């Protein structure tokens, strides 16, 4: 069976190596602005929060939206109740650093850089791009890396959404002081989704952390089920970008 995650990680190593040749870590550190508005400043535990994702393509389903640009999606989300935006910078999702920069220039909401972090370099790169938060996927990092990258992220003035998919991932995340834990309903090997993944993992989660259900949310009923189960918010991409009325769908999922 095709392992999409393994393919992405293998290619990511080459992408990061090329980025380092173009702009060294020392160069990035010299350009970083120390001021940063963190994810946690607007994304609060106890409230219902929608992270709306600017995603044009999926490795499993191909093109998801051919009508809107990433910045157009970002404006729709910001105007209709999203607490935060997730912007892909990985080419498998038609994402790029240039897209992130464009959104950062036009949007005031905090931004999550959505990518596959395998090297500390990417954390500094995210800060240079203007990210308020990064995604750390427990599945592709060792326990030591996960903890180290979390502290590096904080030292740069950003927050981290630590992503888990099963009990082993959850155990690794809970062994760190991570504030935000995202339960990915998408199996990163097959890219199939089900919100049952979140419902099954919630009993193993620390309810003192801010818990986000990621992917597979398509209706207000899905969102309400997750909220009632104990989630503090959702991260939604396909469920927004493929909607007939993206603005109306954003409002529905943001106002649960």
Where are each of the predicted segments found?
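Active-site beta-loop-alpha junctions enriched in small/polar residues
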Residues: 11, 55-57, 90, 116, ...
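Catalytic-face loop-and-helix region of soluble metabolic enzyme cores
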Residues: 180-222, 227-234
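An N-cap/entry alpha-helix motif that binds or orients negatively charged groups
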Residues: 2-65
